[in-house]
Regions:
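N-terminal post-signal-peptidase region of extra-cytosolic proteins
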Residues: 25-32, 60-61, 70-74
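Beta-strand cores of secreted/periplasmic/IMS beta-sandwich domains, seen most often
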Residues: 32-52, 72-80, 86, 102
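N-terminal signal peptide c-region/cleavage motif recognized by signal peptidases
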Residues: 9-11
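Extracellular/periplasmic metallocenter environments
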Residues: 15-21, 67-103
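Sec-dependent signal peptide recognition
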Residues: 1-3
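N-terminal edge beta-strand
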Residues: 15-41
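Histidine- and aromatic-enriched segments that form or immediately flank copper-ligand environments
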Residues: 49-69, 97-99
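Residue-level recognition of conserved beta-strand positions in structured domain cores
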Residues: 24, 46, 58-60, 77, ...
Length: 103
């Protein structure tokens, strides 16, 4: 019973997280700048609408996510200090540059 309560409380906490959306399409990121609340856990929903694979990667934040065409996946970020954090599409490094700004 305790395990069930832990699962239920974890699901409730996940539902309370803000969700930020990022679209990856044809080597471009939309939007290129994501503003997130500082010191708040959040979910990043990443969707690849391009014809080929895309990869969300941030060396600073130690996050990496490969997406096949048409796939949507989520990453959960722990609270971040105020600042700017770079990320990129590893398959399109020239055009797929973005940043997360925690305020």
């Amino acid at each position: 019973m305790t395990f069930g309560l832990l699962l239920a409380s974890g699901a409730a906490l996940a539902d309370d997280m803000p969700t930020i959306k990022l679209l990856m399409k044809e080597g471009r990121l939309h939007p290129e700048m994501l503003e997130v609340p500082a010191m708040t856990r959040f979910r990043l929903e990443v969707r690849n609408e391009g014809p080929g694979a895309a990869e969300f990667e941030s060396l600073e934040l130690k996050k990496e996510l490969v997406l096949a065409p048409g796939v949507t996946r989520n990453l959960v970020f722990f609270p971040m200090k105020p600042g700017t954090y770079k990320f990129f599409d590893d398959f399109h490094p020239e055009t797929g540059q973005g940043r997360i700004v925690a305020k």
